[in-house]
Amino acid sequence: IRRFSELHRQGREDDSRLEARIGAFELAFRMQTQAPEAFDLSRESPATHKMYGTDQKTTKDYAQQCLLARRLVERGVRYVVANVSGKWDSHGNVRDHEKVAATCDQPVAALLGDLKQRGLLDETLVVWGGEFGRTPTAQGSGRDHHPHAFTMWLAGGGVKPGTTYGATDEFGFYITENKVHIHDLHATILHLVGLDHERLTYRYSGRDFRLTDVHGNVVHDILA
């Protein structure tokens, strides 16, 4: 097989597409051989499991995701998603939020603390949020979708700790200070991971496009 590979590469030494394909196959092989160890949470100490809450029914699901996230980050995985299940979309019963929050408060706090004690938080950006908030006014026993004002938080990876940025009116209806558009958030995240969002611009059908549209700005006030 090695000989066939050598013959195939002859005359293609400068073919970047071939190198990219070989690199992709090698990455897939490394993932298949290393994934079982990375996903084996039994290798963690009882104290670590207790810290995350994997031993409790309420927090078990999200705790396992957060603990796995830390193990993946340790091994160089660049992008990890942990989804909180539950009824956040509470049109019918806003009191469910208390139950859902109880499933994730301990695990996410443990994740931040664990990353910090292992020296990983400074080089890991943690982003917590959803696509919209909930209205301050009632919708039956719940709340409606509210995209006009809601909160997201970022930690680690170049973010200034202990900082609150922006404010709403007293009811939480609308933003009154330091409005951050979703494109600004995306521009800031890209900046923190080392990408200039303006250099991702491409031309299509006579106009410019990029991930942050054409008006996103980095929020420098929250950067460390």
Regions flagged by a language model, labelled:
Residues 1-224:
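Ligand-binding pockets and gating/stacking loops
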